[in-house]
Regions:
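Short beta-edge strand/loop motif at the mouth of beta-sheet-based domains
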Residues: 28-29, 48-86, 167-169
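Beta-strand/loop substructures that line and gate deep hydrophobic ligand-binding cavities in soluble
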Residues: 103-153
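Intrinsically disordered, low-complexity segments enriched in serine/proline and basic residues
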Residues: 1-13
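Short amphipathic alpha-helical signal-transduction/dimerization elements
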Residues: 45, 156-167
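Hydrophobic pocket/interface hotspot
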Residues: 40, 50, 74, 93, ...
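Hydrophobic ligand-binding cavity/cleft-lining segments
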Residues: 15-60
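Hydrophobic/aromatic beta-strand elements that line small-molecule binding cavities or substrate pockets
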Residues: 31, 63-66, 89-95, 117-124
């Protein structure tokens, strides 16, 4: 897979005869950021930072709680700034390897968005910063994979703006 490619796997998409069965998608993203793994790791686990970069364009975000430890939970909501409609989601931190790996679950409060997503973030120090890989598994078919991918792209632009800024104290 090349950087910036949409990569999703869904047996329902591969075999049109299986359309009636709900099959989750997998979204994979790759990015290199001009920031240290430590800074990026912190941006994923700090409530104030997440509100700054995670909501896609046109949305505001709120962290209701975030307990960044293995077994700890979090709850967030995104609100469409134009319509005022909110959707909330939360999950549990499954694995935290400082500055290298974050694994957590995601589950929407909306019963029309079923299932539990698994998200894996990997960070690798490279010569010009950090290689960031994101794998989001279990995205329900009711969420078009390309829209999920598009939302992540917007969020990662905002993440780059946050972590790549060099502002003197």
């Amino acid at each position: 897979m090349r950087a910036g490619e949409l990569n999703f796997s869904s047996p329902a998409r591969a075999n049109p005869k299986r359309k009636k069965q709900i099959m989750p998608n997998t979204i994979k993203l790759h990015r290199v950021l001009r920031a240290s793994p430590e800074t990026i790791y912190r941006a994923f686990l700090d409530a104030d930072a997440k509100v700054k970069w995670l909501p896609p364009n046109g949305f505001t975000g709120k962290v209701h709680h975030l307990d960044a430890k293995v077994g700890g939970t979090y709850k967030m909501s995104f609100t469409n700034f134009t319509t005022g409609k909110s959707h909330s989601f939360g999950g549990k931190y499954v694995e935290l390897v400082p500055h290298e790996r974050i694994r957590y679950t995601d589950k929407f409060d909306d019963p029309n968005l079923p299932g539990e997503l698994q998200v894996t973030i990997t960070l690798k120090k490279v010569s010009c910063g950090t290689e960031l890989n994101i794998v989001q598994e279990g995205v329900p078919d009711v969420i078009p994979a390309e829209m999920c991918y598009f939302g992540w792209q917007e969020s990662l632009v905002q993440l780059a703006e946050l972590v790549e800024a060099e502002i003197p104290d």
